[in-house]
Amino acid sequence: MVIDKSKLFVLEKNSLFSGILFLGLLLAYYSTLYPWPLWPIAGHVETVAGFVLLLAFIFKPHNENTILTRNDFLLAVLLYATLEVYQRLVGNSNVVRFMSIPFHVVIFMILFRLDKEVLPRLMQFITKFMAIIELPAIFFFILYIFGFPLPYTDASYDNEFYFFTNYYFFLIDDRFLTWLFPRFQAYFVEPNHNGCACVFLLFYQCGKWKKWYNIVLLTSVLLSFSLTAYVLLVVVMFLNLWRKRKRFLLKIIIPITIIGSVIGGSFLYNDGNNLVHDLILIRLEVEDGDIAGNNRVTKNFEHDFDRFLKSDDILFGRKRDMTEFGNSGYKVYIYEKGFVGLFLLIAFYVAATYKARNMRSLLSAWLMATLYFISNGEITWFQIFIPTYCAAYALPPETPEEEKDNEADEKSLKSIET
């Protein structure tokens, strides 16, 4: 048997090319999650990711036409570049921040050029990697809860804006050190970041929640005690049923019963002195006509935002007082970027996703992005955008065979090999 070595060489280069592309996108994904191992280069991780993606083209075979197949990316890339330049201008960014824009654009351009059949493979890679690093974090966190002594060091981030006890596999915010059961945040700066990132990965994993990696992610969400993550998780449960055109009524009886039992039990158990009641339910109580947990902005900022809406700064935004802690969400984004920034953001999202193959997947992705924007305001963060973008182009599984994990991988691999 004669083996054509030239074909083997092309296949190896193709595999290396796609592998480096995935590695660069994985690095971009974590660049906005700020895991502590990347703190030494915080603010430059996206630049490194963009450089890695450019480096991949050294290994690109001349006849490669199966991974970067899309040519309808120009409008979305131009809108993103415009949005980035605009945000830097209104934010009075320094020269270094402007110099990083081309590398950010490279990340989005590569993502938008990926063939739609390759997106499931990318998401499988990111999801499993997240589960692999979350698993030991959860294990050692549970040991910590039970009082096992673990090595640690003190740590701070963002010019000592955050202070942590770093147990290497997980961080404990110093504000939670006295809690009997602190909120789980894995390697990241906030429990909310960890919980929401896992929820958006689960959002893409429609119909596959019984897989080991999704069980790990679900456990991480529950341990985060993030109200935003919990609300998004419930929304994802219903969206998954809607995307698959399943009947709602019978499917929601069991989860509603479980949620109702947990809520009722939390008020009765130990006279309400328990984790579920103190960390979640008490934040859903209505105080002065508003939900207690709706604390994304302070009262001072709320008054300032009302004055802003009546000012001449409404179009291009105004500089915010950064000394005040605890403000985030859509109001902060509009305050800082103005309604011009909001328009550019919406236009970018629409341009990036409007060619989705399934209307329900597209609407679900837009809804998830909107809900996160209301709460956190930063929907161009890669841990939010990449799963949302891929989910918009996903096809809901219609048969058990289509729900198998390997199908998307096998299709992509076969197309690469040919």
List each model region and its residues.
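Flexible juxtamembrane loops connecting transmembrane helices in multi-pass membrane enzymes
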Residues: 262-302, 320
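N-terminal signal-anchor transmembrane segment
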Residues: 1-63, 80-87, 367-373, 382-389
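Helix-loop-helix junctions and helix-breaking kinks within/between transmembrane helices
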Residues: 35-45, 86-101, 188-196, 213-241, ...
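Hydrophobic transmembrane alpha-helices and their immediate junctions
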Residues: 234-240, 250-253, 336-373, 391-395
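TM-adjacent membrane-interface loops and short helices in multi-pass inner/ER membrane proteins
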Residues: 289-325, 339-343
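Transmembrane alpha-helical segments and their membrane-water interfaces
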Residues: 55-60, 87-143, 345-351
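Alpha-helical transmembrane segments of multi-pass inner-membrane proteins
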Residues: 124-148, 172-225, 230-242
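Transmembrane alpha-helices of multi-pass inner-membrane enzymes
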Residues: 50-55, 365-370, 378-418
